[in-house]
Amino acid sequence: MSDQKTDPPRQLPLDLGHGTAYSRDDLVVSGTNAQAVALVDRWPDWPSPVVVLAGPAGSGKTHLASIWRVRANAVAVDTRRIGDNIANLGARPALIDDVDTGAVDEQGLFHLINAVRGAGSTLLLTARRFPSAWGVALPDLASRLKAAATVEIHEPDDLLLAGVITKLFADRQVEVEPHVVQYLVRRIERSLATAMRVVERLDRTALERKTPITRTLAAETVSAMDEGQGEFEI
């Protein structure tokens, strides 16, 4: 009879589809996003019918845009099919998320802005860069974008990142000690998207091993993800 020890079986976690809450009550506010949050909160009292929310990937633009879309009952417009949405828009507000991800549909965006202005409605555009960096060639569109109100959202600071990480664990009904959260804040890239991936990985690993999420496990997980840099790219 062999005395060789075998590792205990690993629990395979079920994908329960933990969703990230996109309600206003779930929003964590700090100095890096306060101006952008204030703009969303004051809708429809906007300084311009067209607002551009600009900031780096992972800064929370999509979260804010989702909150505004629900509040304003806005139509989410596909950047590849802007023209198809104009006819059915009516007086409803419109949202284009990540408008500068690819080539900007200049004619479509120009006509959409005109339609929104003509209907007395509003348009929210999110982008990584300010409109002046989009390389717009159509003079009329460039003029419209210059008249838009632009609000910058910055990469998360410590307060925001800690709040988001805590909320992400709470969304998964996982309790984590504050010192573990602070360790993650110091170690991971300053990106909300990265925070989501780290929390997801930690939760799955803890379930597989049937262990709580400790600082040691956090360090091991972050180091493993660091070695596979592709998982940290946004």
What are these regions (language model features)?
Residues A148, A162-E175:
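Conserved AAA+ ATPase "sensor/coupling" helix adjacent to the nucleotide-binding pocket
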Residues A87-A127:
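Conserved nucleotide-sensing/catalytic segment adjacent to the nucleotide-binding pocket
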Residues P131-K146:
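Short regulatory helix/loop adjacent to the ATP-binding pocket of P-loop NTPases
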Residues R69-R80, L89:
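Post-Walker A helix-loop "phosphate-sensing" segment adjacent to the P-loop in P-loop NTPases
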Residues A148-L160:
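Conserved AAA+ ATPase "SRH/arginine-finger" region at the nucleotide-binding site
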Residues S48-L64:
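Walker A/P-loop nucleotide-binding motif
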Residues Q182-R186, A193-L207:
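C-terminal helical "lid" of AAA+/P-loop NTPase domains
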Residues M1-R42, P47, L207, T211-I234:
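A short, basic N-terminal segment
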